[in-house]
C-alpha cells in the first residue's frame, strides 16, 4: 500500500431552431487524470484550504492507495463527509485513492486521528471507519477511483458529490447533499440526489445499454449531447425554466415534462428535477 501524506497548518420553455468507437475510447482514457498528479493536486488543495476561515486547528492530510480486484464491481460509501469520483481506464485492476483529512488542536492530535482511520475494502466494499471526535476535532475521507471501463458501481454519499467518467455497467448512484456528474457513461444507470445538480455529458451516436434515469429534488439539470445523437428523451421540472437549444418534436401535452425521440430514438434518457431549471444543449 502506497501512502502519501503532508502536515499543514491550522417555467420559460425555449426551443431554438436552428469517429469510431475505438477512437472515442482512446480519447476517454486520455481524459482520465493521472493518479500521481491527482494525489499531489489534492494534497496541495488540502493544504491551501486550511485556516481560510479563521480556524486555528491543525490539519493532517494523507492519501492511501488501495488496489482491488474489479470482478465483484465496486460498492463505495462516502459516509458523512466524503465525495466519490470514478474514472474508467484501460487497466485490469481498480485503484482507489482514499483522501484523508483530519483536524485537531495540534499536529500530533490531527495525525493521531488520521492514524485511527481504517479504509475497509473487503469484497469490493469500500468504507472508512474512524474514531469518535470531540469539539475541535473532525475527519473526512473522499475517494478517487480508477476502474476498468466495464465495471458495476454502487456509490453512496451524504455530504459530497458523485462523479463518474467513462464507465459502462450497472450504476446505482445516491447522494443527499451533493451533485451527480456523468461523462461518457453507458449501461443501466440510475441516480438520485436531494440537494445538488445533475450534470450529464453524453458521447457517441446513441446510448449503449438499457438507459439513464436521474432525478434531483433541489438542483438544475444540465445535459449535453453530440449532434445527431439518438435516444428517447424525457425531462421536466416543477419549479424552473426549461431550455433546449435545438428543435424537437414533442409527444403528449406540453407542460412541466416533455418526452421526445431524438434522431432514430432508442433507450430512454431521463433527467428530471423538482426545483431547478433544465438546460439541454447539443454540441
Give the positions of each predicted feature:
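Short aromatic-acidic-glycine turn motif
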Residues: 96-97, 102-109, 240-245
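Short acidic/polar N-terminal linker immediately downstream of export determinants
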Residues: 5-10, 21-87, 91-93, 101-105, ...
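Short, surface-exposed interaction patches in beta-rich subdomains
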Residues: 67-69, 188-193, 197-283
Amino acid at each position: 500500500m502506497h501512502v502519501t501524506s503532508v502536515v499543514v497548518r491550522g417555467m420559460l420553455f425555449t426551443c431554438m431552431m436552428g469517429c469510431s468507437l475505438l477512437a472515442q475510447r482512446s480519447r476517454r482514457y486520455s481524459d482520465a487524470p493521472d493518479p500521481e498528479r491527482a494525489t499531489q493536486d489534492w494534497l496541495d488543495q488540502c493544504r491551501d484550504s486550511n485556516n481560510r476561515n479563521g480556524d486555528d486547528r491543525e490539519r493532517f492530510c494523507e492519501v492511501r492507495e488501495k488496489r482491488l480486484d474489479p470482478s465483484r464491481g465496486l460498492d463505495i460509501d462516502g459516509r458523512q463527509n466524503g465525495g466519490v469520483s470514478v474514472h474508467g481506464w484501460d487497466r485490469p485492476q481498480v485503484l482507489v485513492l482514499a483522501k484523508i483529512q483530519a483536524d485537531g488542536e495540534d499536529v500530533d492530535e490531527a495525525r493521531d486521528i488520521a492514524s485511527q482511520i481504517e479504509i475497509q475494502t473487503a469484497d469490493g466494499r469500500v468504507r472508512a471507519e474512524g474514531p469518535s471526535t470531540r469539539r475541535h476535532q473532525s475527519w473526512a475521507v473522499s475517494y478517487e477511483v480508477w476502474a476498468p471501463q466495464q465495471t458495476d458501481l454502487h456509490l453512496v454519499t451524504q455530504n459530497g458529490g458523485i462523479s463518474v467518467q467513462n464507465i459502462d455497467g450497472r450504476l446505482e448512484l445516491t447522494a443527499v447533499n451533493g451533485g451527480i456528474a456523468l461523462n461518457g457513461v453507458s449501461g443501466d444507470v440510475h441516480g438520485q440526489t436531494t440537494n445538488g445538480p445533475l450534470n450529464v455529458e453524453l458521447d457517441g451516436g446513441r446510448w449503449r445499454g438499457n438507459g439513464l434515469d436521474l432525478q434531483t429534488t433541489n438542483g438544475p439539470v444540465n445535459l449535453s449531447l453530440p449532434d445527431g445523437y439518438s435516444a428517447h428523451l424525457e425531462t421536466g421540472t416543477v419549479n424552473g425554466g426549461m431550455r433546449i437549444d435545438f428543435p424537437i418534436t414533442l409527444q403528449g401535452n406540453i407542460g412541466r415534462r416533455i418526452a421526445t425521440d431524438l434522431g432514430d430514438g432508442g433507450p430512454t434518457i431521463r433527467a428530471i428535477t423538482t426545483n431547478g431549471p433544465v438546460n439541454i444543449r447539443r454540441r
